[in-house]
């Protein structure tokens, strides 16, 4: 809708314009300050230019009213233009608010949690954000590949093997053991141990020479758990990339960095000259024992990413990785690549409440709130929606009891109720699409036109949400649209009125916006409640 209006104005005026949406729809559906940008060139006041352009831009099939106000030009869309957009949408629902394929290829990496334990509630935020961002981007025509980086190299894997051994000795064999603070905790370790005993026998767990293999078996067990938990939230990845599988290319990567003069040795360690690109200090990439650091693994991975020739790379990291961005970008530059193609989005902490009090963590679950636990308690739809009600880089606090309420305090219930309400009106009225498809908006009242206009904003909301990497734009829009639907329903008699089918056509486009918007957030709109 916005693109059609913008293209018409630019064609008539033969110049690029900015098109804005006034906060008060009574002023118009769109406005442009183009007269201000033309004032210097035309040597006239913006007010005079705006008045002259109004006549030039008149188009009754597109605009019901064009008005110059203080140098701005306000446009009110015609009912018949809105009707044509609704007719197109309702006859081609699967493509509503969708855009054509774009040439830009994007690699989107998110979650990438260590395969040492199940996902917790903090991981869930990045997972839901990343999945929704991918869904919206793909719908808008971008070629997006989603990827999970498995951190299966380094000391955390050795620690996993030791933790499985200790958990087995404690809970299965009843030994008196003490847990070092750095060891992993949780019932999943016992599950791993039981699986190993079943497959290899109990003696296998006691033999120290098997600890590395135990760690690998544990990693596979945990990754299967992670994949299942993600799938329960409707999240699947195109690629899984193992850190360990990339380490064979470290020597080649190191050689390139050395040739670029980006490494130096000090105190038996090898450093990356990351301060040359704004880092606080140069970073160790090889320890004094000759083992590459965690940063070295990330350097290899990002080289691998760039070697695959995407146009843009998006990483979603936990907020605690903020300081890590500069050093990774420095390495990208040293490898001869363009670090501006890498965009790092941060996912902030989550504070979970229950009944107004902090949610209690279970020691048996490792003193974390498991993602699977909350998904089971409130459902994937509620969890997905609430996690997208705030921008990902801001703190999020919510009470899970609120998400069980059957009223407007529960946003996903409120939105779903609006959609189900419309569906049930059609059922009660005994009306189908053929009964309303030819209905004209010529006599539609202002309330109806406003609801139609709001419903048709979905595409521009999606474009803005993806461009700003802010899914909150969509959740806000859907909640406000649901509010408008409820208001319209409460203020206008529908079934049995003279305007019944006209109003049903209005509600049809509103329901379609709700359905498509929720789908792009990974949520299925309810038909009945």
Curated annotation (Swiss-Prot):
<keyword id="KW-0648">Protein biosynthesis</keyword>
<protein>
    <recommendedName>
        <fullName>Arginine--tRNA ligase</fullName>
        <ecNumber>6.1.1.19</ecNumber>
    </recommendedName>
</protein>
<keyword id="KW-0547">Nucleotide-binding</keyword>
<dbReference type="Pfam" id="PF00750">
    <property type="entry name" value="tRNA-synt_1d"/>
</dbReference>
<dbReference type="InterPro" id="IPR001412">
    <property type="entry name" value="aa-tRNA-synth_I_CS"/>
</dbReference>
<keyword id="KW-0436">Ligase</keyword>
<dbReference type="InterPro" id="IPR009080">
    <property type="entry name" value="tRNAsynth_Ia_anticodon-bd"/>
</dbReference>
<comment type="similarity">
    <text>Belongs to the class-I aminoacyl-tRNA synthetase family.</text>
</comment>
<dbReference type="GO" id="GO:0006420">
    <property type="term" value="P:arginyl-tRNA aminoacylation"/>
</dbReference>
<dbReference type="InterPro" id="IPR001278">
    <property type="entry name" value="Arg-tRNA-ligase"/>
</dbReference>
<dbReference type="InterPro" id="IPR005148">
    <property type="entry name" value="Arg-tRNA-synth_N"/>
</dbReference>
<dbReference type="InterPro" id="IPR014729">
    <property type="entry name" value="Rossmann-like_a/b/a_fold"/>
</dbReference>
<feature type="short sequence motif" description="'HIGH' region">
    <location>
        <begin position="113"/>
        <end position="123"/>
    </location>
</feature>
<keyword id="KW-0067">ATP-binding</keyword>
<dbReference type="Pfam" id="PF03485">
    <property type="entry name" value="Arg_tRNA_synt_N"/>
</dbReference>
<dbReference type="InterPro" id="IPR008909">
    <property type="entry name" value="DALR_anticod-bd"/>
</dbReference>
<dbReference type="InterPro" id="IPR036695">
    <property type="entry name" value="Arg-tRNA-synth_N_sf"/>
</dbReference>
<dbReference type="GO" id="GO:0004814">
    <property type="term" value="F:arginine-tRNA ligase activity"/>
</dbReference>
<dbReference type="GO" id="GO:0005737">
    <property type="term" value="C:cytoplasm"/>
</dbReference>
<dbReference type="InterPro" id="IPR035684">
    <property type="entry name" value="ArgRS_core"/>
</dbReference>
<dbReference type="GO" id="GO:0005524">
    <property type="term" value="F:ATP binding"/>
</dbReference>
<keyword id="KW-0030">Aminoacyl-tRNA synthetase</keyword>
<keyword id="KW-0963">Cytoplasm</keyword>
<dbReference type="Pfam" id="PF05746">
    <property type="entry name" value="DALR_1"/>
</dbReference>
<comment type="subunit">
    <text>Monomer.</text>
</comment>
């Amino acid at each position: 809708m916005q693109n059609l209006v913008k293209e018409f104005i630019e064609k008539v005026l033969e110049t690029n314009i900015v098109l804005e949406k006034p906060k008060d729809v009574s002023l118009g559906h769109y406005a442009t300050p183009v007269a201000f940008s033309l004032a210097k060139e035309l040597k006239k006041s913006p007010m005079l230019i705006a008045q002259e352009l109004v006549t030039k831009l008149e188009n009754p099939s597109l605009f019901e009213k064009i008005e110059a106000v203080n140098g701005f030009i306000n446009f009110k869309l015609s009912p018949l233009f809105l009707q044509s957009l609704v007719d197109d949408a309702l006859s081609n629902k699967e493509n509503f608010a969708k855009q054509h394929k774009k040439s830009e290829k994007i690699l989107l990496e998110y979650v990438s949690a260590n395969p040492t334990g199940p996902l917790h509630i903090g991981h869930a935020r990045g997972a839901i954000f990343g999945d929704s961002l991918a869904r919206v981007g793909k719908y808008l025509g971008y070629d997006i590949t989603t990827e999970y980086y498995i951190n299966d190299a380094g000391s955390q894997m050795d620690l996993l093997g030791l933790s499985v051994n200790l958990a087995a000795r404690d809970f299965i064999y009843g030994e008196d053991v003490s847990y070092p603070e750095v060891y992993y905790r949780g019932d999943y370790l016992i599950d791993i141990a039981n699986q190993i005993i079943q497959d290899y026998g109990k003696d296998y767990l006691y033999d120290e020479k098997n600890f590395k293999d135990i760690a690998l078996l544990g990693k596979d067990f945990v990754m299967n758990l992670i994949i299942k938990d993600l799938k329960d939230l409707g999240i699947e990845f195109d690629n899984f990339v193992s850190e360990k599988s990339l380490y064979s290319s470290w020597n080649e990567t190191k050689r390139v960095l050395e040739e670029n003069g980006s490494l130096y040795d000090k105190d038996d360690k090898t450093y990356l000259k990351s301060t040359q690109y704004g880092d606080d200090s140069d970073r160790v990439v090889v320890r004094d024992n000759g083992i590459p650091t965690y940063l070295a693994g990330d350097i290899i991975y990002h080289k691998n990413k760039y070697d695959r020739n995407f146009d843009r790379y998006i990483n979603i990291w936990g907020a605690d990785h903020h300081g890590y961005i500069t050093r990774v970008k420095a390495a990208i530059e040293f490898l001869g690549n363009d670090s501006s193609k890498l965009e790092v989005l941060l996912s902030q902490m989550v504070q979970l409440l229950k009944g107004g009090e902090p949610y209690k963590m279970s020691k048996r679950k490792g003193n974390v709130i498991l993602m699977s636990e909350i998904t089971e308690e409130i459902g994937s739809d509620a969890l997905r929606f609430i996690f997208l009600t705030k921008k990902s880089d801001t703190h999020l606090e919510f009470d899970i009891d609120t998400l069980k309420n059957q009223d407007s305090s529960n946003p996903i219930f409120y939105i779903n109720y609006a959609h189900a309400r419309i569906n049930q009106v059609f059922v009660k009225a005994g009306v189908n699409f053929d009964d309303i498809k030819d209905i004209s908006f010529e006599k539609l009242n202002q309330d109806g036109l406003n609801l139609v206009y709001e419903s048709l904003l979905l595409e521009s909301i999606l474009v803005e949400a993806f461009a700003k990497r802010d899914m909150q734009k969509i959740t806000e829009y859907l909640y406000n649209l649901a509010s408008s639907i409820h208001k319209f329903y409460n203020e206008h008699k529908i079934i049995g009125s003279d305007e019944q089918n006209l109003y049903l056509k209005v509600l049809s486009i509103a329901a379609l916006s709700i359905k498509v918007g929720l789908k792009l957030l990974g949520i299925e709109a309810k038909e009945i409640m």
